[in-house]
């Protein structure tokens, strides 16, 4: 391994924040991770950089996962099992499965990032999470010096959470995900639980949608609501939808009857962070070069020339506004480096 030095990381994060890595290595094969000298390095594992806030320079080795490949591993009477390399673009992979007649991931169309990063955050949208379709994750464990396969049930998936985050492996670089296997059930049913998707399909006069129809609807809705990172730098949804106790949700609903709320299996209630931010006066508002997007208050955008410190200032201001108005704490989704 022969890493580059003092590498500009601006092109490698979708918020286009400045920062440099002391050492940078693009990884295109799992074997590259077995180099003995990597064990003692301070490491950070980078995917698509779409869930990352750079707060300055990184004084270690940044491993940029770019392992390619996608294939049908096996098929049985109930499902297809498809493997993809960690470096595969997530949206491109989803569309590839659909063109081959393997439905199941269509609601996750157009989410930025890579396949390898998807399980870490347990990405989700429009009524579907990666955990719903994931079979197993394979990754290199730098401590054990071994390639591990972690089954879905051992990944401890939760809302925007997983074993990889709970153990801090996404921060300390202990495990580098190299590939993911998905289980796509043959007994497919369209997932139209979200009103935006159902409305888009109705507008297109599609009563019995295919998986590709769902994907097309999701893409259309996302393109209308969310900024393209290539044009307006952003990291997608910036805050988790907060989950509160039922008694607090009821009190808030009494005061704000239009508050969107979603009962959870454990009896608590999930609230819509975007709605809270908008009602707190932050939709389309900025603090210096960083603000909340005018079409979707949940998305934080870099309006030009922002730094990680600018992002942190705006984040804190939004959190304070929501806390003051609703007594609800917002937690950021991205990783801070």
Swiss-Prot record:
Main location as per UniProt: cytoplasm
Protein location: Cytoplasm
Entries under Gene3D superfamilies matching the protein: 3.30.465.10, UDP-N-acetylenolpyruvoylglucosamine reductase, C-terminal domain, Uridine Diphospho-n-acetylenolpyruvylglucosamine Reductase, domain 2
Molecular functions (GO terms): FAD binding; UDP-N-acetylmuramate dehydrogenase activity
PANTHER family, per the entry: UDP-N-ACETYLENOLPYRUVOYLGLUCOSAMINE REDUCTASE
Function field: Cell wall formation.
Protein name per the record: UDP-N-acetylenolpyruvoylglucosamine reductase
Organismal lineage: Bacteria, Pseudomonadati, Pseudomonadota, Betaproteobacteria, Rhodocyclales
